[in-house]
Curated annotation (Swiss-Prot):
Record-listed phosphate binding positions: R87, G125, T126, R127
UniProt GO molecular function: 3'-5'-RNA exonuclease activity; tRNA binding; tRNA nucleotidyltransferase activity
InterPro entries: ExoRNase_PH_dom1, ExoRNase_PH_dom2, ExoRNase_PH_dom2_sf, PNPase/RNase_PH_dom_sf, Ribosomal_Su5_D2-typ_SF, RNase_PH, RNase_PH_bac-type, RNase_PH_CS
Natural source organism: Synechococcus elongatus (strain ATCC 33912 / PCC 7942 / FACHB-805)
Catalytic activity: tRNA(n+1) + phosphate = tRNA(n) + a ribonucleoside 5'-diphosphate
Protein name: Ribonuclease PH
Amino acid sequence: MAWIRPDGRRPDQLRAIAFQRRFTQFPAGSVLAQFGQTQVLCTVTIQAGVPRWLTGQGQGWLTAEYRMLPGATPDRQSREWLKLSGRTQEIQRLIGRSLRAAIDLKKLGERTLLIDADVLQADAGTRTTAINGSWVALQDAIAQLIAQGELTESPIQRSIAAVSVALIGGEAFLDPDYPEDVQADVDCNVVMGDRGELIEIQGTAEANPFSRTQLNHILDLAEQGIAQIQAAQLEALR
């Protein structure tokens, strides 16, 4: 039986997207990113200096932290204190890698950009929403450095965006929500630049393997969705 999307979307249709800039007062960049019912607060803090292993090399650094608030899901999640779960570590590394691909660290100078992605409400796609919102917040943080005379030009060299694609019953669905995510035979997360460059592909078969032809279709669908997300990012920055 063919899968019918619970919210009535077409297979190639994204959820409703919103980027609310300057959501909080103090970070250099602060964006509430929303994809459907998923909400992630993405902030960027600027710190002088770099990790010890980069000191004296004349370049900056960007790193990310990711957490889910206890009330982000129907059942309360315990806060992660001393030990992070493998999932949390994987996601925050993905966010950091993705955002570093967007920026020329040599043009940043010896300063560190700290990305914090806090999930307020989770309905699948939290890691991709975090990447998308963090890129918008990063733009605001860099604009602040330029306005303060700390930088003369932006080190951001490309826009980046991310989206998930699920295979359910052999058919690909763009930007799945939670009911679709739990039904997926294959779950893929794709991060791309604004010229179609691939930054990261995460693809996992939950039960049966998937074919190269299906992977190509997944990437085509992801590229289509990412182009729309990047347009929404740029619109939010106007």
